[in-house]
């Protein structure tokens, strides 16, 4: 599995700000979008371009355009919605596919409850967004669903990943690509990433 920990100074700085314990909902939400935007920049670096002639201000001009890439952004509800706009900043024409999965707090197992996928998803590159890759269960279940529907080009974008989640994802889906702003130390006994960000969903939506 291709694993990219994006170590750009802007990414490191913004993620560091997100680790503040008393960060406001507004600030956390803004930073989640900004870091997702920077991860998207990295995740799309292998997109091919082609020469296209357009009408410029002084006659025809040849420019580079991305070659035939249909993209769907796949936020995992609910926290993934906090990263979606960061992707759409760069790919505004992307279709949105929504997958609802929550983690049982006792078993830590993923429980699917909703999905609405883009049409012709088998022809698209899926960019799955979720702030945290902890146990990996929700991400694996989401990718299982995408592959069942014929989507086999999948990139995963997360703010923070735990080694345990990376290992589980790689075992289940070695063909996907993972882009993360940080690989943290470990999971605690409650399945939270340490040092992590806390509950990203609560911080994005202002709930507890």
UniProtKB/Swiss-Prot annotation:
Reactions catalysed, as given in the entry: UMP + diphosphate = 5-phospho-alpha-D-ribose 1-diphosphate + uracil
Return the broad EC class: transferase
Q: Which residues bind 5-phospho-alpha-D-ribose 1-diphosphate?
A: 78, 103, 130-138, 199
**Which Enzyme Commission number(s) are on file for it?**
2.4.2.9
Name the SUPFAM superfamilies on file. Answer: PRTase-like
Gene Ontology biological process terms, A to Z: UMP salvage; uracil salvage
**Among its keywords, does the record have Coiled coil?**
no
Report residues binding uracil: 193, 198-200
Q: What's noted on cofactor binding?
A: Binds 1 Mg(2+) ion per subunit. The magnesium is bound as Mg-PRPP.
Q: Which cysteines are joined by disulfide bonds?
A: none
- The scientific name of the source species is Vibrio cholerae serotype O1 (strain ATCC 39541 / Classical Ogawa 395 / O395)
Give the protein name, as stated in the record. Answer: Uracil phosphoribosyltransferase
List the cofactors. Answer: Mg(2+)
**Pathway recorded for this protein:** Pyrimidine metabolism; UMP biosynthesis via salvage pathway; UMP from uracil: step 1/1
Arranged from A to Z, the UniProt key words for this protein are: Allosteric enzyme, Glycosyltransferase, GTP-binding, Magnesium, Nucleotide-binding, Transferase
Q: Which family does it belong to?
A: Belongs to the UPRTase family.
Annotated control of activity: Allosterically activated by GTP.
TM ranges? none
| The keyword Nucleotide-binding belongs to this UniProt entry's keyword annotation | yes
Q: What does this protein do?
A: Catalyzes the conversion of uracil and 5-phospho-alpha-D-ribose 1-diphosphate (PRPP) to UMP and diphosphate.
Give the Gene3D superfamilies listed for this entry. Answer: 3.40.50.2020
> One GO molecular function term?
uracil phosphoribosyltransferase activity
């Amino acid at each position: 599995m291709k694993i990219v920990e994006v170590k750009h100074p802007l990414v490191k700085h913004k993620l560091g700000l997100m680790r503040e314990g008393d960060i406001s909902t507004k600030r956390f939400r803004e930073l989640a979008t900004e870091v997702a935007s920077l991860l998207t920049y990295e995740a799309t670096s292998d997109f091919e371009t082609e020469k296209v002639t357009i009408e410029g201000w002084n006659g025809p001009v040849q420019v580079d355009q991305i070659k035939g890439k249909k993209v769907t952004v796949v936020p995992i509800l609910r926290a993934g919605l906090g990263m979606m706009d960061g992707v759409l900043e760069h790919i505004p024409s992307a279709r949105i596919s929504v997958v609802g999965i929550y983690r049982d707090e006792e078993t830590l197992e993923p429980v699917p409850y909703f999905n609405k996928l883009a049409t012709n998803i088998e022809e698209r590159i899926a960019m799955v967004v979720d702030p945290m890759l902890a146990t990996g269960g929700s991400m694996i279940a989401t990718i299982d669903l995408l592959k069942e529907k014929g989507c086999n080009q999948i990139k995963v974008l997360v703010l923070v990943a735990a080694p345990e989640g990376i290992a589980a994802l790689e075992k289940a889906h070695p063909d996907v690509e993972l882009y993360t702003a940080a690989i943290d130390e470990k999971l605690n006994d409650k399945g939270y990433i340490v040092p992590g960000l806390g509950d990203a969903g609560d911080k994005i939506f202002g709930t507890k």
